[in-house]
Amino acid sequence: MQYNEKLDAELKALEGDMIETLQRWIRVPSVRAERSAENAPFGADVRRALDTAMADLKRLGMEPRDVDGYCCDTEIGEGDEVIAVLSHLDVVPEGDGWDHDPYGAEIIDGRMIGRGTSDDKGPGVAAVFAMKAILNAGIPLRRRCRLILGCDEECGMQDLEYYEQKIGLPDRGFSPDANFPLINTEKGGLKLALHAALDDARLIEIASGTRVNVVPNQAVSVLAGDWREAAADAFDVDDEDCALESELVDGNTRLTVTGVSAHASVPEKGKNAAKMLVHVLAKLGIGGAPIALLDEAAGRESAGEDLGIAGSDKVSGALTINLGLLFAREGKIDVTFDCRYPVFFNPETIGETVQRRLAPAGYALEPIKPSVPHHVPESSELVSKLMDVYNTITGESAKPFAIGGGTYARHLKEGVAYGMMFPGELELEHQANESIDVANFVKAARIYAYAIVALCA
């Protein structure tokens, strides 16, 4: 890789605009909702985020194309071959526990705070301004670089499925939606939804979780009668980040367990409030076999050992499982797990094992629809060039690695995830107080600019 003084000068000149643009994007609470119009399949706020992004692309001299509200795209460069850069505008719900406005985009002590700063509006804006700097620097590209900004990455990627059917996806590219240096392997993804009858009149309700791909940081249960003292005795978690609160309301006890949210691909980084609540209920003897077995089989770890599905391979590492959604009411309990499984594992076997483990308590598993694992060899031209850019700019000698998260990259025949979180950096995606280091945001844009030049020039 060779440095380009003109490109670096353009990147420097664009820094202020880049930061202000990200703040503008963050201030739109683009959480998926029901279709609100023909061109708003994911709700009005997501549509507003798309309009905001397209307006900025036009302002910067690019020509965005609206793909029926599912996403937008824009290109720079010439030639028949296309390299894709895939980012997304939708975010997970903000949840509780924020110290600042989750959509305020405040900059405090060098960090911009807000939902979407790291996942994935920040990386998207960095890619936009990388492309703008290349345009301003007048660098000719023999391949086209196509930026695609999606609107449904967090809830199943229907946006890219629609795009692929209507437009068609390039074969190669990267998604700035994870970590540097580079991720060439993504585990398979599996949603395991189970249901069982619940025969205990004392258990009025359980509610925990907003999305299956988030470790729930709050869990609430309502019990008939006064269970305040017994519940306090049953809560055996010694952690300042976790708590149990109880109150008597109209003769019933409302229990609220607080934990710490995290991305479901790294459940060990969170403290699962749903599992803590299940453990309390099991110790109280409430909920019968469905609660007792759930606590025994899934309430104590996140590697799948107690469910009988634990394991790993050399390519992608260990299986993880997150109890992401837990609801009970009117004699029924609904449990949904997010499982990230290694490349060489069979998802059907995982589902069958979980069903067998929980069947004694009456649980039935819905049909599974796995997201298959994804792997790009380290020896590929794509990986080699992107790693060269990263290592040259950072001075490191880093190697690619695997993650449990699923990014847009898996939709490409040869796609990888590439930043924008740096090694050792504070990672707060899907958590309260999500934020990014502004200096690293600027640094990532520089890496993306040189990466696009390396792949397309």
Residues of each region from the PLM?
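Acidic/His- and Gly-rich active-site-bordering loop/insert found
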Residues: 2-115, 139-141
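Generic non-transmembrane alpha-helical segments
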Residues: 10-17, 21-28, 52, 56-60, ...
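Predominant activation on well-ordered alpha-helical scaffold segments within soluble catalytic domains
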Residues: 23, 54, 125-132, 161, ...
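An extended, acidic, His-containing surface patch that forms the Zn2+-binding/catalytic region
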Residues: 65, 227, 265-330, 336, ...
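Active-site metal-coordination/substrate-binding segment of hydrolases
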Residues: 82-149, 155, 167-171, 431-434, ...
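Acidic, glycine-rich active-site loops and adjacent beta-strand->loop/helix elements
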Residues: 89-91, 145-155, 177-181, 210, ...
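Midchain, well-structured core segments that form catalytic/ion-binding scaffolds
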Residues: 154, 160-342
